[in-house]
Amino acid sequence: MTFEPSATLRDPFVLYGESFGSRLLLGTARYPSPATLEAAVQASAPAMITVALRRQGAVGDGEGGQAFWQMLKALNVPVLPNTAGCFTAQEVITTAMMAREVFETPWIKLELIGDDYTLQPDTLNLPAVAETLLKEGFKVLPYCTEDLVLCRRLLDVGCQALMPWAAPIGTGRGAVNPHAMRVLRERLPDTPLIVDAGLGLPSHAAQVLEWGYDGVLLNTAVAQAAYPVDMARAFAQAVAAGRTAYLAGPMPEREVAQASTPVVGMPFWHADNTEQRA
C-alpha cells in the first residue's frame, strides 16, 4: 500500500522558490550497504538527499566513489551537498565550490562546525560564511542552533530557509529545548524551518511538525536503525501525520479536566444540578 500524505497536496513545501512534494530530507551516510540506502530512499520518497563531499568521496578516483555517485543519480532525487567536517570559513567555501561543480547544483547545506565534541555550529562566524556563499550564487540552507538572534542574523544576510537542530547531531534525543524551538517558530512564522539534527524517533519528527516546523532532515535515525528501510518509511508517515495535524488545528491545552461528553439532555442532569446547589 502506498502512503499518500494529504497535507503536501494542500500546502507545497517551498524552498528558494522551488516546490517539493515531501517535507523529509534524508542523509546518505552510515547505512549498512548501498542497497539499503537505495531502498530507504525509495521507501521514504524524500524531497532531497544530502551528500557530504568530504566524507563520501563521491568524486574520488576509486571505483567505489564513482559507483556511489552513479547510484545516487539513478535515484532521481535532488541532491543537497553539505559541508560536513568543515571547521573554517575557507574549508566551507572550498568544499561548496567543489560540490557545486561535481553535483551540478547551486544547493548547499552549510555546516560550519565550532566544536568537534558537540558538533555545535560556529554561530559567531556562520552568518558571514552564509553571506559569502549567497553572493556566490548558492541556495544556502544553514545548519544552526535554535537561537533566535542567530537565526534572525542568518535571515538578514539573505538566507531564505534555516535548519536549526533539535539536539546535537547523532544523539537521537529529540527536542531538548522545546520552549526555544516553539518560540523560534512563533517569532519566524514565514520562514521555512527544517529541523536538522538530534531526532531519533518518528514521534520526534511528528512533534516538531505539529509545532509548525516545515520539515526534517534525518540520517543516523534511519541509517543506524535495526531495519533502516522500515524506519525510513515510518519517518515519512510521521512527517506527513505531523504536518496534517498542524494544519488541522490541534485543540488547546487546558489545566483542568473538561468532559468530552455533554450532560445537557441526559436523564436527571437538571435534578442532579439542583440537588448540588441545595
UniProtKB/Swiss-Prot annotation:
It comes from Cupriavidus taiwanensis (strain DSM 17343 / BCRC 17206 / CCUG 44338 / CIP 107171 / LMG 19424 / R1). The gene is thiG. Keywords: Cytoplasm, Schiff base, Thiamine biosynthesis, Transferase. It is found in: Cytoplasm. The active site is at 109 (schiff-base intermediate with dxp). Belongs to the ThiG family. It comes from the Bacteria. Pathway: Cofactor biosynthesis; thiamine diphosphate biosynthesis. 1-deoxy-D-xylulose 5-phosphate binds at residues 170, 197-198, 219-220. Homotetramer. Forms heterodimers with either ThiH or ThiS. Its EC number is 2.8.1.10. GO terms for cellular component: cytoplasm. This is Thiazole synthase. It catalyses: [ThiS sulfur-carrier protein]-C-terminal-Gly-aminoethanethioate + 2-iminoacetate + 1-deoxy-D-xylulose 5-phosphate = [ThiS sulfur-carrier protein]-C-terminal Gly-Gly + 2-[(2R,5Z)-2-carboxy-4-methylthiazol-5(2H)-ylidene]ethyl phosphate + 2 H2O + H(+). Its main location: cytoplasm. GO terms for biological process: thiamine diphosphate biosynthetic process. InterPro entries: Aldolase_TIM, Thiazole_synthase_ThiG, ThiG.
